[in-house]
Amino acid sequence: MRVLLTGGAGFIGRHVLRELFARGHEVRVLDSLRPDVHATGSGSTVGGAELVIADVRDAKAVDRALEGVEGVLHLAAKVGLGVDVGDLPDYASSNDAGTAVLLAAMARAGVKRLTLASSMVVYGEGLGRCEEHGAVRPPPRSAAAMAAGSFEPPCPVCGRPLAPELVDETTPFDPRNAYAISKVAQEFYANTWAQVTGGSVAALRYHNVYGPGMPRDTPYAGVAAIFTSALRRGEAPQVFEDGRQRRDFVHVRDVAAATVLACERHVSGVRAFNVGSGTPRTVGEMAHALARVLHGPKPVVTGHYRLGDVRHITADSSRLRRELNWLPQVDFDQGMAELAGL
């Protein structure tokens, strides 16, 4: 299949590109190579794919990039936490308007298969379980509570501590920052496009992705990259809150495999898929694991916090396994050891 891969010069995009080539697809990459995401010179080659250097908001460039294409994998986006109000226009323009421009161009070109990179952030705090009230949606955490060292979100009914729950794709949207809002908007735009054109959408809600090629020294570096960079400088990783916040860390090669499978196998309707390892870990666990494999200093739990961060978000990825026959291949210990060898 001939496909267009937006954001194909980025961290996840490069791995998706390799997976597409490995499975025999012909790929055209569209990427703006924006300097706040790409290190100098990175992305100037994309492994033999045709590269269109352009912004996804450039309708004429997107029209040209879609010529002869059968499907689109849309990964181009501004990422990060998105808690600075000054960043709101960039998130809305890069992610929301960019997706709208792409979808309009796909409608003009008659391209009806979309694989969309969404994110676990659409769920906000996800779900928690109260001993008395069962599964509930945790409220936003207050600055006052976190400043006092109280990091667990309370039950919105009785105020008791909540146990974290796995979230599946039926969990309601609850975006807590600009990036999350933009990802929800992308999914809604894609759903509307599919209804009007009869196209298909596979929205892949990536959980915490790590692995080779992670951005290390940009504003968008994930926690694994931040910890690794600190350890390579001989510094102790700085762990926010109490280190017990839970995440589903999933290797980028597994994410790439899921993305390409969705492109190949989901051919009708609109469907969301969580992409996670299925094994929740705490942020503190990751920091200690990286410190061990890199023979670095022990992590320091700082108690610092960021408004807009969620406490726990862990995936139920059974739909992806069941419907697309996907299984993660890289376990946590193997992934940590691989990071140490980079």
Locations of regions flagged by a protein language model:
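NAD(P)-dependent short-chain dehydrogenase/reductase
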Residues: 127-147, 153-163, 178, 188-247, ...
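Active-site proximal helix/loop that lines the substrate pocket
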Residues: 77-83, 119-122, 208-214, 244, ...
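CheY-like receiver
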Residues: 64-68, 105, 230, 258, ...
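N-terminal Rossmann-like NAD(P)+-binding domain of SDR-like oxidoreductases, especially those catalyzing
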Residues: 1-203
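Short-chain dehydrogenase/reductase
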Residues: 84, 207, 272-275
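Structural element of the ATP-grasp superfamily
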Residues: 102, 190, 227, 320-321
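Residue-level signal for the nucleotide or nucleotide-sugar donor/cofactor binding architecture
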Residues: 57, 86, 94-97, 170, ...
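C-terminal substrate-binding subdomain of Rossmann-fold SDR/epimerase-dehydratase oxidoreductases
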Residues: 231-342
